[in-house]
Amino acid sequence: FREELRKLGEYDNTDYSYLNDVELTDYLKRDLTGLVGDERVIQQCVNQTVSRVHQSMEAFVHNMNTIHSRGGNQVVFSSINYGTDTSAEGRCVIREILNTTYEGVGNGSTAIFPIQIWKKKRGVSYLPEDPNYDLYKYACKVTARRFFPNFLNLDATYNQDADWDPQDPKRYVHEVATMGCRTRVFDNKFGPRTSIGRGNLSFTTINIVRLAIECMGIENKEERIAT
């Protein structure tokens, strides 16, 4: 936003730096018709900012589906978790990643990566009066068309953290996240519970049905378990 103010000031030969710290409740594109003075300047810069954020999200999704950097022949299996940032800037990023996902890539194809996870939380996006409820509804519309985002319930007993505070700008530290399509990242035997700076070294898939088929003919329980 500040960069757009500077660029507009250079074009108009006007110093708009006094608007650098103007409080914005949301970044939404609007028609400039009928707007004058500072209101028009602010909205024009907001419009440009939203366009740049959208283009950045398009580039991000495109790169995650085209850059082969995993063993040299596979795109990165990437995941992003979002939904609890209620700041104007955070909501803008969330809205534009959802817009990009809804539109699709290329000729309208569904992007496989990054895997997207919406974190749903009471007081944030659970009820109509919550600040991000509008984005949650849009996320539902996007997932109905594109399969993403998936949804993670932060209010589930095993996902709750007593240190989570809606007024804490770093509350994401106390939020569960998921990686890929199977890994829940939060619990920690050797330190505080958090998803920040965490990951997995490898993944394991157990074919329980196959194990049952292989053991179904073994009558002795101990031998069956050992097998």
Task: List each language-model region with its residue ranges.
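Conserved catalytic cores of very large enzyme subunits
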Residues: 1-227
